Amino acid sequence: MHNVVIVGAGPAGLSAAIAAAAAGAPVLLIDSNPRLGGQYWRLPADNFGDQHDQHFDLDTGLLLINAVKDRKEIEIYSGAQIWSATHKDGINTLRVLHNGVEKIINTGNLILCTGAYDRTLPFPGWDIPGVMTPGGVQSLLKGHGVLAGKKVVVAGSGPFLLPVAAGVIKAGGEVVDLLEANKSYRWLLSPLVLLENVSKLKEAFYYIKTISKARLRARFGQAVVAAHKGSDGSLESVDIATIGRKFKIKKIRNVKCNVAAIGWGFTAETSLAGALGCKQSVAKDGGVVVVADQDQQSSIPGIFVAGEITGIGGSELSMAEGVIAGISAAKFVGCKVEVLKAHRKRRAKKQRFANALIKSYPVKAGWISWLNGQTVVCRCEEVSVDNLKYAIDELGATDSRTAKLLTRCGMGLCQGRVCGRSVVDLVAAELHISPSDTDRFSAVNRPVISPIPLGVSKGRIRFSHDNIKAMAWSFNCNRTSI
């Protein structure tokens, strides 16, 4: 049994590993990426050259990464994929694919720092090649030095649009339009928070400087509402709409581009925590997060959580939570260490900034009005808006889970990571009700955490007779009615 096991090697996981090791606890650090740093400090392979200019504060990241590598108390599993997790009698069992071999890890002390991924909203044409998430565009730049396209529209909502636009410009691309759906004045709702988080202002100005040099001006209250493909089947242009406070379309213009990077903030990656049984809640932005106490401990003793899975808040909050989680986990296994008042004070300051983010970049329900009946909602299973409406109006679905069973929406390769949140909103809107917490939780929790080779699951996953009947019924409904 390992002493302290940490999942995720981004800002939170690296900080937790160093804090726990410094307190005297042996640490196993597991990450799915081949290199440490997470998405925020994504590093290229050695043969792809230096991508330093794609980062704002890479020095801090390299400092943490090298500190983790230098600690003899820390063992690292890079490129490791956790596909199953269970909790029983105080022991957490992780099934991990590492170097082509399945390993079973048992631990009573776990820190989950699994981060987040881009939140997407469906719209007509969003499945055309060339329509990407901002995170996807940035991953290509940071990890491989690859520019996704020469003429790029960056759109959606949230501060993450700034580094992506700046990164495209630095790589030699043209940002045709930079669009923020919300109004610029919304940050004025939290002036004191801005003043106490000067480092975040410096980061924003760092990106704005690059954007301004390219003579690019952000346009507020505008969004991409449709995409169009050319004769080769790839993206040729997008429709950009001026939208109102509730995201309803006012007027539309068409812009030529070959890449559209569109994102609406982030969704916390809570699958692993959900599989272990950690208590979850719905945040103010409608996303599911894991509940944590003042020591970053979840509802299950011995399982600690830090970073974006406790609420989207950025790298600095993730590091602050990671330090507290690492110290708390070390104390849990008997190390004589305490969380300092300064640690909690730093976390509180960064948490206030995170709360201001939610207020400044809301995603209004009016986005649903951008869709038509043929708009694809689930790209994996090619389920349209009309398919969902048929499941509700004709087949009697009364919640998103039933609609999923009737249409296979969210049952493809991504297991609902891309469409799950939108499906919950769309089904609720069609039923004229508010999305329930149960529907929100159902959209993010899954028994098999990530896709795996069938050979690995042989003999491990068993279906009851009722499971098989339900799947057969769902299959027949799909064949005959959709």
Regions found by a protein language model. Give the residues of each.
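Residues forming the flavin
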Residues: 1-413, 417-482
